[in-house]
Amino acid sequence: MSPQTETKASAGFKAGVKDYKLTYYTPDYETKDTDILAAFRVTPQPGVPPEEAGAAVAAESSTGTWTTVWTDGLTSLDRYKGRCYHIESVVGEEDQFIAYVAYPLDLFEEGSVTNMFTSIVGNVFGFKALRALRLEDLRIPPAYSKTFQGPPHGIQVERDKLNKYGRPLLGCTIKPKLGLSAKNYGRAVYECLRGGLDFTKDDENVNSQPFMRWRDRFLFCAEAIYKAQAETGEIKGHYLNATAGTCEEMIKRAVFARELGVPIVMHDYLAGGFTANTSLAFYCRDNGLLLHIHRAMHAVIDRQKNHGMHFRVLAKALRMSGGDHIHAGTVVGKLEGEREMTLGFVDLLRDDFIEKDRSRGIFFTQDWVSMPGVLPVASGGIHVWHMPALTEIFGDDSVLQFGGGTLGHPWGNAPGAVANRVALEACVQARNEGRDLAREGNEIIREACKWSPELAAAC
């Protein structure tokens, strides 16, 4: 062996599996204001110490690989590596830990959720040293969030566009979700809008199938919107689903919606992908379209408690990528959603500044600086008896979306919409008069039933 080879070997370039904690576990590290911070729920394999597991997460989601490579000497690992800077046990779980990891800002491309997730929730989730791994929360520093456009318009601009203030907005998903012709679909939209709803919605499954091509649906829905607006004197909208198999086709559908003069389009942001979603958000801001976001596929990612990613992370990513509405659970309907946790990520969607609050699952203080907020959409198995609770829980800056709760009315779509609007107006008025919606909600609805036969029939 030559002296030169011996020197290289002694300098630390010997092949072999290495301990990650020697390089990537840094409990003395003081986080920087520009760091992206992550909280991972780590379940190590038996025999793997938590410090090694946390360091492995930091390494494999940043600069690390399983062995020392000679090109490590060509860059500054201290500048670019992720660092596991704190580990704590999960209460009630012997084998689970929260590992806090700090990432230098230079690891990520500006304005790209796709690039951020490729590192932070990439191959590390298949790492053999871990039985399970879940990303619980992210802290996005202003230095990074300012590289994103964010929502096309935001809450205040949407209210100004619609000229609707002081109450939640009302919506309805048209059912059956699949099988209607475009003309019958448009008729259902018209009946709901003329009855008092602000919005109707394409189901996320509706794209451009043989029974109803997208262009036909857009035309009949636009006709329904204009007719309902003329009759009610209110601005109406229908979430026209622009989701498509290619970005080019998606933008083509959004262009047609703009040409029809409708106010809003829709996108399935997880199924469609963050790159497509960000492209559509840019188009919507440039062309005055609101953007409704559906979260189809989220439960594949966020439902398991020890593996995947919490929805609060997906919600933060959506605010960065761009959307004016996003479905956020109901707390009271058919779909899963714990109240305090749900309100935690609802605040992350709407507010400018959110303090750390572990009781609500918020691991980091988040400052969105000037990024517009996103309206949370409550939908899934809700009806008029839920209206007091929904009004109290979600407040004015929300969209309450009743599918079966509107279309299932015994008298039809329009009376179902009337029932929802009357229930909402009654709850808002009662709240403004100082009544307790949580305690008096049922009584408020019963009182409103006396002067609204449509609401009485719905109850």
UniProtKB/Swiss-Prot annotation:
Transmembrane regions: none
Describe how it is modified after translation: The disulfide bond which can form in the large chain dimeric partners within the hexadecamer appears to be associated with oxidative stress and protein turnover.
Q: What note does UniProt attach to the cofactor annotation?
A: Binds 1 Mg(2+) ion per subunit.
> What Gene Ontology cellular component terms go with this record?
chloroplast
- Where in the cell does this protein reside? Plastid, Chloroplast
Q: Which InterPro entries does the annotation name? A: RuBisCO, RuBisCo_large_chain_AS, RuBisCO_lsu_C, RuBisCO_lsu_C_sf, RuBisCO_lsu_fd_N, RuBisCO_lsu_N_sf, RuBisCO_lsuI
User: Which sites are catalytic?
Assistant: K175 (proton acceptor), H294 (proton acceptor)
Which cofactors are reported in the record for this sequence?
A: Mg(2+)
Propeptide feature ranges: 1-2
| Sites where the protein binds substrate | N123, T173, K177, R295, H327, S379
Which reaction does this chain catalyze?
2 (2R)-3-phosphoglycerate + 2 H(+) = D-ribulose 1,5-bisphosphate + CO2 + H2O; D-ribulose 1,5-bisphosphate + O2 = 2-phosphoglycolate + (2R)-3-phosphoglycerate + 2 H(+)
Q: Where is this site: Transition state stabilizer?
A: K334
Q: Which Pfam families match?
A: RuBisCO_large (PF00016), RuBisCO_large_N (PF02788)
Q: What else is known?
A: The basic functional RuBisCO is composed of a large chain homodimer in a 'head-to-tail' conformation. In form I RuBisCO this homodimer is arranged in a barrel-like tetramer with the small subunits forming a tetrameric 'cap' on each end of the 'barrel'.
Q: State the family named in the UniProt similarity comment for this chain.
A: Belongs to the RuBisCO large chain family. Type I subfamily.
The protein's job, in short, is: RuBisCO catalyzes two reactions: the carboxylation of D-ribulose 1,5-bisphosphate, the primary event in carbon dioxide fixation, as well as the oxidative fragmentation of the pentose substrate in the photorespiration process. Both reactions occur simultaneously and in competition at the same active site.
PANTHER family in the cross-refs: RIBULOSE BISPHOSPHATE CARBOXYLASE (PTHR42704), RIBULOSE BISPHOSPHATE CARBOXYLASE LARGE CHAIN (PTHR42704:SF15)
Name of the protein in its database record: Ribulose bisphosphate carboxylase large chain
This protein's species is Streptopus lanceolatus (Rose twisted stalk)
